[in-house]
């Protein structure tokens, strides 16, 4: 199901906007599985390849450009970062996958950390699988999607940096074929941290997790 701001009703958009105008703060970081905290609040996670724009997107929807550290260098996020939104939601920023320019041991550590969290979090309500609009769906993205399905995790696909793509027709076809292969149906959104395209619809979808 392709989703955009027009497809989300006004009530949901308003609820999402109100929630994400609330106070949000960093509450924990985990560099290994033993450091992962157990919150009593519902969690929403952002996962994707290195430099896909996870931190920028989190800053955009939370209206705080300094919340999650942003870098043009892939592999900047080296731990799981947890943010508390108004004592109603925990936003989870996962390390990027697929970054080659780190020692193999570090890369494996990140993969174990990401996989463990996605498999074992008791409060995880929704995973946002971020994919660079300019690059399309890659093998690593498919592996993560398959991991989520195997563990019965609900997810939606977020194409980032949509302002840099003129025609999304090919992407639409690609993602529909991808979902058909997985035998899965979910929201698909196009967002841009620069132009704010899609931010409102994304906030509305995340706000629904409070009642899930």
From Swiss-Prot:
GTP binds at residues 48-55, 75-79, 93-96, 160-163, 191-193. InterPro entries: G_ENGB_dom, GTP-bd, GTP-bd_ribosome_bio_YsxC, P-loop_NTPase. SUPFAM superfamilies: P-loop containing nucleoside triphosphate hydrolases. Mg(2+) binds at residues 55, 77. One of its GO terms (biological process) is division septum assembly. PANTHER family: ENGB-TYPE G DOMAIN-CONTAINING PROTEIN, MSS1/TRME-RELATED GTP-BINDING PROTEIN. This is Probable GTP-binding protein EngB. It comes from Rickettsia akari (strain Hartford). The lineage of its organism: Bacteria, Pseudomonadati, Pseudomonadota, Alphaproteobacteria, Rickettsiales.
């Amino acid at each position: 199901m392709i989703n955009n701001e027009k497809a989300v009703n006004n009530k949901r958009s308003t609820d999402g906007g109100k929630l994400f105008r609330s106070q949000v703060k960093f509450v924990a970081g985990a560099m290994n599985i033993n450091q992962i905290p157990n919150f009593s609040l519902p969690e929403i996670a952002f996962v994707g390849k290195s430099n896909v724009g996870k931190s920028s997107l989190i800053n955009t929807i939370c209206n705080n450009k300094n919340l999650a550290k942003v870098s043009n260098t892939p592999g900047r996020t080296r731990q799981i970062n947890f943010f508390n939104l108004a004592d109603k939601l925990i936003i989870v920023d996962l390390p990027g996958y697929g970054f080659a320019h780190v020692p193999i041991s570090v890369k494996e550590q990140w993969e174990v950390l990401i996989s463990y969290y996605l498999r074992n979090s008791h409060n995880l309500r929704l995973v946002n699988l971020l994919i660079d609009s300019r690059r399309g769906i890659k093998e690593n993205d498919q592996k993560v999607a398959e991991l989520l399905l195997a563990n019965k995790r609900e997810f939606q696909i977020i194409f980032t940096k949509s302002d840099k793509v003129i025609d999304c027709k090919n992407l639409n076809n690609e993602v529909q074929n991808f979902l058909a292969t997985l035998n899965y149906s979910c929201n698909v959104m196009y967002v841009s941290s620069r132009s704010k395209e899609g931010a409102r619809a994304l906030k509305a979808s995340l706000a629904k997790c409070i009642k899930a």
